[in-house]
Every structure is written in C-alpha cells, then in structure tokens.
Amino acid sequence: MIDLQLLREDPDVVRRSQLSRGEDPALVDALLTADTARRAAISAADSLRAEQKATSKSLGAASAEDRPALLERAKDLAEQVKAAETTQAETAAAFAAAYMAISNVVLDGVPTGGKDDYAVLDIVGDPPPLSNPKDHLELGEALGLIDMQRGAKVSGSRFYFLTGRGALLQLGLLQLALRLAVENDFIPMIPPVLVRPEVMSGTGFLGAHAEEVYRVDDLYLVGTSEVPMAGYHSDEILDLSVGPLRYAGWSSCFRREAGSHGKDTRGIIRVHQFDKVEGFVYCAPTDAEVEHQRLLGWQREMLARIEVPYRVIDVAAGDLGSSAARKFDCEAWVPTQGSYCELTSTSNCTTFQARRLATRYRDASGKPQIVATLNGTLGTTRWLVAILENHQRPDGSVRVPPALVPFVGTELLESPR
C-alpha cells in the first residue's frame, strides 16, 4: 500500500504515477473520498460513544425526576452508536478496497510507456557466431537433458522432466547462485511454497495477476519465493541497526501462465513449474536504491559466471507489477530467437509490501517505521535455455561453463551412448 501521508499531502504525485503506469488516476480521487468518509465515520462514532458513556455515568447520580429522560436518551444513543458503527465498518471496507486498488508510486527516472518502452542500460558480450543454431529443446532432447513429451504425458502441457545432466546442470546453477548469495551475507532459506491469502495479497500478487496463481484449498502456490520471504517478518519490528537483512530462498515456483496463450510454447522458457533462487532484502527506505543496485550487481555476477551475452533494461512504468516502484531486467541473448529473453528481474518495492504486511524497523530515535523490501532473481530454470543455446558447438554438443563443471561433472554435454 502507498503512504497515506503522501496521498493526502501531494495527491498529484500519485495521480502522475497512475498515469505513467497506464492506470486510472481517478482511483486516487476515489481513495481520497473514501479516506475522508472513513475518518468522518470514525469521528462521528467516537463522539457518540463518548456521549453514551457520559450519559450512562449520569444515570447513576440522576434524580428520580431526571432519570426517565436520561434512560430515553441512553436508548436513543445506543441505536445511534449501533448505526454509526455500521457506517464505520462500511466506510472502512470501502476505504480498504480503494486503498488496495492503487499501485506503488513509481520512482523518478523510470521510463514512461508500456512493455516496449524500456531503456537499455548496458549490453554485455557479443552473440556467438553460430550458423544454423539449434534451439534449447532440440539440444536438450538430443543430449538427454530435457523430456517434454513425458512431462506432458504425466502432467500436461508446459511441464517437463530435467534428466541426467540436465538435472545436474540446474542443481549446479542454483547451488552456484546460493553460494554467491551466502558469500554476500544472505541467509539461505528453503521456504514453504503454499501461503495464506493475506500473504499472497500482501505482496501484491492477487491484483491484476491473480489469474496466474494456483489455489489449493485455502492456500496459494507461490510463483516466486519472494512471497513467503516477504511474509516471513509480517507483523514484526526488525533490527536493522547493522544494515539490511538479506535472505536467499530456494523453491519450486508455480504459474498458470494464463495470459501467455500461444507465447513461448516450445521448450522450458514459459512453464507451469520451475525452480529458482530468489534474493530478498529488508532495509531502511533510505538504503533501498543503493540495495537495488547491489542486487543488480549480484545478478550480473551470476550471468558473468555462466558466460552468456546479456543486456540490462530499466523496465517502463506500464510494465511494472503493482508492488514495484522500479524494476531492472537482465535479458540473455537467445540465438534461435535472434533476440533477448528475460533471465532475471530485480524490483525495488519501497514500503509498499511492508505496509500491507505490517513489517517495521526502529529508526535512530527508536520509533517504529515501515521497512523497504526488494527482490531479485539469482538463478532459475530458464537460464538453461541461454546456457544450452549460447554454448552449443557445431557437432551438437554443449560446452559447460567452467563455474558449473564441478556440479555437472563434465566440461562437455554430449549425446548419451
């Protein structure tokens, strides 16, 4: 949720943010109206309760002559208080709905526009000089690494098996990511992948993208370990006196991909289940932008270790999720597509998620304040696409990046004999 003080003092900032996202600025006025109505209802109910309390007190000392009128007034006040409390509850519900409808306020400098209006910040490495490259699925099947056919037989479309050294390649990649995280003071974590609705909602994943989320009974399957790690410290006051608190969560992730019909249907680029190591940071809001750059730096270090060409983009406001105030993506070159494909994203969510989840820290004066939260991918299944396609050789084998050789057990992936 956004900062109500900012809304009340400078609503134009929020309106401009809504416009830059391509969202309705009228939602800001609806929230202001709901806020005014809620506060008025609270004040009215409080005044009536105070009068009711005073009247009840007067009854004890009232004379026989005054008592009937006071009793009548007490009865009338009881009805008024009941009605006022109903109004208070209704205005509170309307306010909560209006409040949840507003996305995070976009930071200054974020490109305006939609999906294709990103700004390219850096390009690293050159596409490999491949003639007639094979795609990752053709390579994966020929080398005994990926089995989509049996994945579909067992679970349906967009499911797969990673087999043999394909499994080792992913496990090695994620272990490498976790090792990098630990070297940089992240606390490793294997979180639950089923979460309560209030945690999923608190992270902003039950808004426009609710159709992407699987539900099992009264719990939700996470599409990223960002969700349980954001909920980990809900309703807590953190000690950030020694600096940001960093976690690295390794989990399976689940997505319906409801909005991607017909897109990336071949192979493992866009699937219903995958594995990921996600970095998550709690910090003071004043440290958030610096921490965002650190997360991006660690992502770039991981990409350097797997030796693939990539670019960094500053995602446009209209392509941001509701929780993100700014997001950087690292996109690797995919030879068979002749284009870049997202491998990582890192988002600065400022205080938006933490305000919903009531996560705070104590400032220098000891006063509780809302923390900032950030997240960033450190490794995921999709990275295998870039590794296989960029490191393929003319004979159909694939060179294993040296950083992954100790995990995979070979320098070259070749057809099984």
From Swiss-Prot:
Class of enzymatic activity (EC top level): ligase
Could you state one GO biological process linked to this protein? Answer: selenocysteine biosynthetic process
> Can you tell me which residues bind ATP?
R255, R256, E257, V271, E342, L343, T344, S345
User: Which Pfam families does its entry note?
Assistant: Seryl_tRNA_N, tRNA-synt_2b
The pathway is:
Aminoacyl-tRNA biosynthesis; selenocysteinyl-tRNA(Sec) biosynthesis; L-seryl-tRNA(Sec) from L-serine and tRNA(Sec): step 1/1
Keyword DNA-binding attached: no
Say which family it is in: Belongs to the class-II aminoacyl-tRNA synthetase family. Type-1 seryl-tRNA synthetase subfamily.
What is annotated about its quaternary structure and interactions? Homodimer. The tRNA molecule binds across the dimer.
Domain comment quoted from the record = Consists of two distinct domains, a catalytic core and a N-terminal extension that is involved in tRNA binding.
The protein's name is Serine--tRNA ligase
